[in-house]
């Protein structure tokens, strides 16, 4: 049986100057601009027919603070599709509290790289289906990696970064996703710092490299500018494609995106299904 390909909107949430949660968009994990209210945007995407919804607290890890659980709870009250929440999750207590706030899945990046056993413990305590490992990867054109791919005629590898892309780790992203799979991750959420916010398309070489390395479902993220970019991600092996700007700024609707993909032959759930 052919598995349905998923279309997933995402909101990046930070605290505004008054300390209130707000949605922001940026380019290459920088140049953040106010976009809207997280609860209102969640409600909008739920009603629009999204397959899932992702809420990322984009500064919790870097600032060493807890995830905005009150806001997560308010968002969970408005969405009746699977909700993934990431940002600031460092241990199993954080996972538990995030799930209690209404998340169906948690996305972990920095916390899992700092302590890889968190993947094992999270999967054992809550089930692999709850544990999404997020990878914020960037291209490196040097000889310090382990797995190389060709990009525009040059050989590069993909480095894992932490704390919202602010710090490199020296860790090869392909090595890490394979380890995360072995430890029990139920899904992999692959972000490209190079493509983020550009709307020039996903980093297809990155997506393909991850999909070729693992059997765990992969969500492609960063760089979507049109439904055709999602098709490219699916062709590279992704099970789901995540987008932000094209939906936030009404460049494409969820319904229009799904119709375009379905017409192109991809197995897509209808918005009103």
UniProtKB/Swiss-Prot annotation:
<dbReference type="InterPro" id="IPR013785">
    <property type="entry name" value="Aldolase_TIM"/>
</dbReference>
<dbReference type="GO" id="GO:0000105">
    <property type="term" value="P:L-histidine biosynthetic process"/>
</dbReference>
<comment type="pathway">
    <text>Amino-acid biosynthesis; L-histidine biosynthesis; L-histidine from 5-phospho-alpha-D-ribose 1-diphosphate: step 5/9.</text>
</comment>
<feature type="active site">
    <location>
        <position position="136"/>
    </location>
</feature>
<dbReference type="GO" id="GO:0005737">
    <property type="term" value="C:cytoplasm"/>
</dbReference>
<comment type="subunit">
    <text>Heterodimer of HisH and HisF.</text>
</comment>
<keyword id="KW-0963">Cytoplasm</keyword>
<comment type="similarity">
    <text>Belongs to the HisA/HisF family.</text>
</comment>
<feature type="active site">
    <location>
        <position position="12"/>
    </location>
</feature>
<dbReference type="InterPro" id="IPR011060">
    <property type="entry name" value="RibuloseP-bd_barrel"/>
</dbReference>
<keyword id="KW-0456">Lyase</keyword>
<dbReference type="InterPro" id="IPR004651">
    <property type="entry name" value="HisF"/>
</dbReference>
<keyword id="KW-0028">Amino-acid biosynthesis</keyword>
<keyword id="KW-0368">Histidine biosynthesis</keyword>
<dbReference type="InterPro" id="IPR006062">
    <property type="entry name" value="His_biosynth"/>
</dbReference>
<dbReference type="InterPro" id="IPR050064">
    <property type="entry name" value="IGPS_HisA/HisF"/>
</dbReference>
<protein>
    <recommendedName>
        <fullName>Imidazole glycerol phosphate synthase subunit HisF</fullName>
        <ecNumber>4.3.2.10</ecNumber>
    </recommendedName>
</protein>
<dbReference type="Pfam" id="PF00977">
    <property type="entry name" value="His_biosynth"/>
</dbReference>
<dbReference type="GO" id="GO:0016829">
    <property type="term" value="F:lyase activity"/>
</dbReference>
<dbReference type="GO" id="GO:0000107">
    <property type="term" value="F:imidazoleglycerol-phosphate synthase activity"/>
</dbReference>
<comment type="function">
    <text>IGPS catalyzes the conversion of PRFAR and glutamine to IGP, AICAR and glutamate. The HisF subunit catalyzes the cyclization activity that produces IGP and AICAR from PRFAR using the ammonia provided by the HisH subunit.</text>
</comment>
